[in-house]
Curated annotation (Swiss-Prot):
Protein name from the UniProt record: Polyamine aminopropyltransferase
Reaction(s) the record says it catalyses: S-adenosyl 3-(methylsulfanyl)propylamine + putrescine = S-methyl-5'-thioadenosine + spermidine + H(+)
Alphabetized UniProt keyword annotations: Cytoplasm, Polyamine biosynthesis, Spermidine biosynthesis, Transferase
Record flagged with keyword Transcription regulation: no
Origin species: Clostridium perfringens (strain SM101 / Type A)
Lineage: Bacteria, Bacillati, Bacillota, Clostridia, Eubacteriales
Amino acid sequence: MELWYTEEHTDKVRFSIKVDEQLYSGKSDFQRIDVFKSQEFGTFFTLDGLMMVTEKDEFIYHDMIVHVPMATNPNIKNVLVIGAGDGGTVRELTRYETIEKIDMVEIDKLVVDVCREYLPQTANKLDDPRVSLFFEDGLKFVRSVENKYDLIIVDSTDPFGPGEGLFTREFYGNCFKALKEDGILVNQHESPYYEEYARGMKRAHKRIKECFPVCRVYQAHIPTYPSGHWLFGFASKKYDPLNANIEKWNDLGLKTKYYNTDLHKGCFALPNYVKEMLENVDE
């Protein structure tokens, strides 16, 4: 009998991957965690039935959430990562010798433990000496921090369940306070394509705009995320990613599978329907 993983993107659209075997299934205090093995996408894991990471396409997401801000400000030294229990965001950050400290706040320790065992491709740098792990609520963590970080990356789940608090006005305001005077905030910004995801995207964008003087959105194509069209938010107290001297990033000699400085410029060029959504977030 064939085994298929199926995710409902809407009540009328489903996405499926043929599964060779289920490697893990468990429930933490926060969510259900499943790990599957497939021929097409390698090992992948889901939270409450929603796709988080696959071995085959994780490089796209992690390249874009890390290298865009790092190319915008090459002097980033102290980083806070919220969520990111699979470790892929931390893995990419550790490639920068200039980074001195990475604090990672993940509410669910079991996610990290499972990814260490079944997804070493993404979790293999969590033991880097610059990395400190905090298993607590990211919303509460940033409340007590002020003027500490050069970069905050919010690598969260969708705006419901354990990740819901990471899409609030209070949270973004606390991130602003936790950043230094030239700090950058980057977050996964959902998809603009399906209505439910678009609502979450617009709500998050509106709240970030209320907090930061520089607020932009960029995009990537991620095959296993709903619609494949995925957005990221870029907010800053000072730096505009389109006016930065990003060519200096090439001098670092980092080998990436997705990100490059041409793509950096192009990813901020948005389709008209997305531009209209962002222009109308106040309505």
